[in-house]
Regions:
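Small-residue-rich helix-interface/hinge motifs
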Residues: 4-5, 12-64
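Membrane-helix interface motif
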Residues: 30-40, 107-126, 264-273
Length: 284
């Protein structure tokens, strides 16, 4: 199996995660600014200045929008994955990882519902938990939501099994169950684990709870795919396409890491719909 495929998968996952995490935080802060909550966006959390503006109406909309955004982006990126030609291997696996990460973040918010405890500055990963608390849902209902999210993770693993295998270089290799399992293991699971380590080391020193929840969700999806890949699956590949190392992906990852580390170390402020600031002096 071509090692370039594994490297490209690691890079694609890291780029996808960093990109969608930023969009997730930005959408929450943008919604909060619309309701006059005066948010300040940090690398690892969002602070709100106008606490008197929190109402049940505002809470539901501010903390629902990021989860819905994750799901919508996941669907959009999956459609892009389906439209990209097979010869553009890196773009295909990048869009596929973006779709998977969108689902991971959406299901992570559902899974975290029972573990929510109110805090003045609730972090984004328990966004649905905030809404559940304000709607006074009982603990049994919250656990039902979490259980439903686990079922969706397994279903997601089944759905993405076929899509993961469509990134293989040769259709003849996919006829063997052992190759399919090795492909999921080396091109999906290993890059996922290494990509999460890279993301954690780069950007989230104070956001470990979020990463743990996302890590569990993604791991369950991929392990489900690994199990389902043992079945006989006919994967449609129009022709064999060797994988080459993507310098575009590596460049994108480098730019994103530099973007995050620069903002985290020095801080950048600008005026818009909300005050946008990232700095390392603020602990959330």
């Amino acid at each position: 199996m071509n090692s370039s495929l594994t490297i490209n998968s690691i890079v694609s996952f890291a780029v996808a995660f960093l990109l969608l995490h930023f969009i997730n935080e930005y959408s929450t802060a943008f919604a909060a600014s619309y309701f006059g909550l005066k948010p300040i966006m940090y690398v690892h959390s969002i602070k709100y200045s106008a606490y008197d503006m929190w109402t049940p109406y505002n809470v539901k909309r501010v903390f629902l929008i990021s989860g819905i955004m994750n799901l919508v982006l996941g669907i959009i990126f999956f459609r892009l994955f389906m439209r990209v030609k097979e010869k553009n291997k890196w773009y295909r696996i990048f869009f596929l990882w973006c779709s998977v990460v969108g689902l991971i973040m959406f299901l992570g918010k559902l899974l975290a519902v029972p573990f929510y405890e109110f805090k003045p500055d609730p972090p984004g990963y328990i966004a649905f938990g905030v809404v559940a608390a304000y709607k006074y849902l009982g603990l049994s209902v919250k656990w039902m939501i979490a259980g439903f999210s686990i079922l969706l993770m397994i279903a997601g693993g089944l759905f993405f099994t076929y899509q993961f295998l469509r990134n293989a270089e040769s259709k003849d290799q996919l006829k063997k169950g052992e190759f399919r399992r090795n492909f999921i293991f080396k091109v999906i699971l290993i890059p996922y684990l290494l990509g999460m380590v890279l993301v954690a080391a780069t950007n989230f020193p104070n956001n470990i709870k979020t990463l743990i929840i996302y890590f569990f969700v993604g791991l369950l999806i991929i392990i489900s795919s690994l199990i389902f890949s043992s079945r006989t699956i006919k994967v449609l590949l129009h022709k064999d396409e060797p994988q080459k190392l993507s310098f575009i992906g590596i460049g994108m990852l480098g730019v994103l890491i530099l973007f995050y580390l620069t903002l985290y170390a020095k801080g950048i402020g600008c005026k818009g719909y909300f005050d946008f600031l990232m700095c390392c002096d603020c602990k959330g």
